[in-house]
A protein has these predicted regions:
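Short histidine-centered catalytic/ligand-binding loop motif
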Residues: 98-102, 153, 163
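Aromatic-residue hotspot detector
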Residues: 92, 152-153
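Non-catalytic DNA-recognition/assembly elements of restriction-modification systems
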Residues: 1-35, 44-56, 143-152, 158-192
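DNA target-recognition domains and sequence-specific DNA-contacting regions of bacterial/archaeal
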Residues: 18-145, 196
Length: 197
């Protein structure tokens, strides 16, 4: 854990803040095999995202019919590119060595945990292929403020995350619209010559 500086607190850690471990403040698990029901696109049956160790599309692998994780949580890539951290706010299924941390909410929030992990330099073990293991990662230290401060912090950052998620949904809709319209424009099926631009 990198050195902590407490300038706003006269360079001292507040008495009611503690240094704990990820194993103490979260329920940690590693993703397993992909589910039996998998769809490449979201359907009425398969509405829950499946996330893998990949970096593209935040690890989105596909969709399935039953979530494994329902709580707001954090995932960390555990093989290959180690330490890619994502905040997950909708129910999902983690697969293929993706580590999931479900925070114990009496200690910490998922948003605080996510932002704490984002600023860490997370390293794995192994010479041929780097990997992060649950037992090893559970020992990682984390600063835990008082419950009052965690609640206040989470309340302050929640609207920012809501805005990010809303923008992501809007971007996906616009990308889908572009992909539908562009071939029609290029083929001449859709005529825009009369538009006054």
């Amino acid at each position: 854990m990198r050195p902590l500086y407490f300038e706003p607190f006269n360079n001292q850690k507040p008495n009611n803040w503690t240094i704990s471990t990820l194993g103490n403040i979260s329920i940690m698990s590693a993703g397993g095999d992909k589910p039996q029901n998998v769809s490449q696109t979201k359907t009425n049956l398969c509405q829950y995202p499946i996330y893998s160790n990949s970096l593209s599309k935040e690890g989105l692998y596909g969709f399935t019919d039953k979530p494994k994780i329902s709580e707001e949580s954090v995932t960390v890539s555990a093989r290959g590119t180690i330490g890619y951290v994502c905040l997950r706010h909708i129910p999902y299924v983690p697969i293929v060595r993706l580590i999931t941390l479900v925070p114990k909410t009496e200690a910490i929030s998922a948003k605080y945990l996510y932002l704490w992990l984002k600023q860490l330099h997370i390293v794995g073990t192994g010479t041929t292929q780097q990997q992060l293991t649950v037992p090893g990662f559970q020992k990682t230290k984390i600063l835990v403020p008082s419950q009052e401060i965690v609640t206040l912090f989470t309340t302050m950052v929640a609207p920012l995350f809501q805005k990010i998620w809303s923008n992501q949904i809007e971007n996906r809709k616009l990308s889908s619209l572009r992909n539908m319209l562009l071939p029609k424009l290029m083929s001449g099926e859709l005529d825009v010559s009369d538009l006054d631009l």
